[in-house]
């Protein structure tokens, strides 16, 4: 079995693959203070709850945008799975030309998403990932990574609004009954949901105008289904795109 780990600034997503089949997946908080023992015990508990045997893990692959956690995660893998993990980074065989001024600047998660999306759809693409930051990654019809855009994430915007506007409460990120809110909570939700939908559709329209081929727009991340349900540009949602990309990259670099 393959253990795939996607470490984001806010959440860490884990998946267990048997061949090309995702057997189980979890989302946990990314913690800078957990020790490798605490991470190891947490994973063993998750495996036990799913009826999975840690001893059956033959490989581990990790994409992380939190460099300080690299040593902790490596030690966790070695001590609790007896496996040295493969980290996504410069020098890895991606099968995708990275046409960025400095390819080393491209986050591991963005490369992983791009590889997974092109492997599945084989066409010009925009991958929108709703994480701590909302990222747009553009892939050409030839399978080249062209670049993209980075925006503040939905959670960051919600936190900033609640922190900076003392009379505005923190609200659940949910689609309101109408874009015209009839109370404070609904008004904030309307601004967040339709504001982000407008941003996504606007940026994707600008990207399409610059490309020779109209791109398919794919969304991933925990909030992708909600935004996709309102967006005019998003045509596909794959919440496990990053995990699938990790599986593909592991296969290409074994």
Swiss-Prot record:
Transmembrane segments: none
Cofactor(s) listed: NH4(+); K(+)
Cofactor stoichiometry and binding remark: A monovalent cation. Ammonium or potassium.
Keyword entries, A-Z: ATP-binding, Coenzyme A biosynthesis, Cytoplasm, Kinase, Metal-binding, Nucleotide-binding, Potassium, Transferase
GO MF, one example: metal ion binding
Binding site for substrate: 100, 107-110, 184
EC number of the protein: 2.7.1.33
Chief subcellular location: cytoplasm
Binding site residues for K(+): 129
Highest taxon of the lineage: Bacteria
Keyword Signal: no
Gene Ontology terms: biological process: coenzyme A biosynthetic process
Classification via InterPro entries: ATPase_NBD, Type_III_PanK
Location within or outside the cell: Cytoplasm
Binding-site residues for ATP, renumbered to this chain: 6-13, 132
Quaternary structure annotation from Swiss-Prot or TrEMBL: Homodimer.
Family under the similarity heading: Belongs to the type III pantothenate kinase family.
Name of the protein in its database record: Type III pantothenate kinase
UniProt source species: Anaeromyxobacter dehalogenans (strain 2CP-C)
């Amino acid at each position: 079995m393959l253990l795939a780990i996607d470490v984001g600034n806010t959440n860490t997503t884990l998946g267990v693959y048997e061949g090309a089949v995702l057997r189980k997946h979890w989302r946990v908080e990314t913690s800078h203070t957990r020790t490798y023992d605490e991470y190891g015990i947490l994973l063993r508990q998750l495996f036990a709850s799913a009826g999975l045997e840690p001893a059956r893990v033959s490989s581990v692959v990790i994409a992380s945008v939190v460099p300080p956690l690299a040593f902790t995660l490596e030690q966790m893998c070695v001590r609790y799975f007896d496996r040295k993990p493969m980290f996504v980074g410069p020098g890895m065989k991606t099968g995708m030309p990275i046409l960025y001024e400095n390819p080393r600047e491209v986050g591991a998660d963005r490369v992983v998403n791009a590889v997974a999306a092109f492997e599945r759809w084989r066409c010009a693409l925009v991958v929108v990932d709703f994480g701590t930051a909302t990222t747009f990654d553009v892939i050409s019809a030839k399978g080249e990574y062209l670049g993209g855009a980075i925006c503040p994430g939905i959670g960051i915007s919600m936190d900033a609004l609640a922190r900076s506007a003392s009379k505005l409460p923190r609200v659940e990120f949910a689609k309101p009954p109408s874009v015209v809110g009839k109370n404070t909570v609904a008004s904030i939700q309307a601004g967040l949901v339709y504001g982000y939908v407008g941003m996504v559709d606007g940026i994707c329209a600008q990207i399409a105008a610059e490309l020779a081929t109209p791109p398919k727009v794919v969304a991933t991340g925990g909030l992708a289904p909600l935004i996709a349900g309102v967006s005019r540009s998003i045509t596909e949602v794959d919440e496990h795109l990053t995990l699938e990309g990790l599986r593909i990259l592991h296969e290409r670099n074994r």
